[in-house]
Amino acid sequence: MPGTLYVVSAPSGAGKTSLVNALVRQDEAVSLSVSHTTRPPRPGEEDGVNYHFVDRDRFQALVAQGDFLEHAEVFGNHYGTSRSAVQALLDQGQDVILEIDWQGARQVRERMPGCLSVFILPPSREELRRRLTQRGQDEPEVIDRRMAEAVSEMSHYAEYDYLLVNDDFDRTLADLQAIFTANRHRLERQEPLLAETLRDLLG
């Protein structure tokens, strides 16, 4: 049976990437889609692992070819998700996570209506600013811009199926895992897998 496509969104600093990476490590049935981006790699990031890093000309060529399930501009950089790569994983029975913003999520819902979506919130504005500052990667004016972008991103929370608040990492990870586990036990997914057992029980 094909896997389920999940969209996970959050403002920068909410802990989305750490949560998603932890889920992928602990659940073999979950894969993370590797997006294309025009932004430069951050320290420790690897091409093909964290992102496919491409220049703007290559990115626009992929857009023109219709290769992206979704694409968006965030903080002046472009991000996109390969349609064929996602479909290949789903066909293998893997649940696939797209770690994208609300703009990309809206595009994916239109093109793949069966996807499920999760929005992750920080516990407070103060905590979000602390996390962004703690990274040590950005100047104060950049932090201010990211905070403004975060408020804009969070205003779209109601477009999602599930809402989590990342105030305790382990608890939030368990809640995220519970969403995936519960979906796998929906009737329409379990009935084909349990066909023989059901025949035996009801025969």
UniProtKB/Swiss-Prot annotation:
Predominant subcellular localization, coarse grouping: cytoplasm
CDD domains assigned to the protein according to its UniProt record, in alphabetical order: GMPK
Annotated compartments: Cytoplasm
Keyword check for Glycosyltransferase: no
UniProt: ATP binding residues: A10, P11, S12, G13, A14, G15, K16, T17
GO cellular component: cytosol
Catalysis performed (reactions): GMP + ATP = GDP + ADP
Domain of life according to the entry: Bacteria
Pfam family, one: Guanylate_kin
InterPro entries listed in its UniProt record: GK/Ca_channel_bsu, Guanylate_kin-like_dom, Guanylate_kinase, Guanylate_kinase_CS, P-loop_NTPase
EC number: 2.7.4.8
Key words, A-Z: ATP-binding, Cytoplasm, Kinase, Nucleotide-binding, Transferase
Domain Guanylate kinase-like: 3-181
Gene Ontology terms, MF aspect: ATP binding; guanylate kinase activity
SMART domains named in the record: GuKc
Similarity comment: Belongs to the guanylate kinase family.
Function in brief: Essential for recycling GMP and indirectly, cGMP.
NCBIfam families assigned to the protein according to its UniProt record, in alphabetical order: guanyl_kin
Protein known as: Guanylate kinase
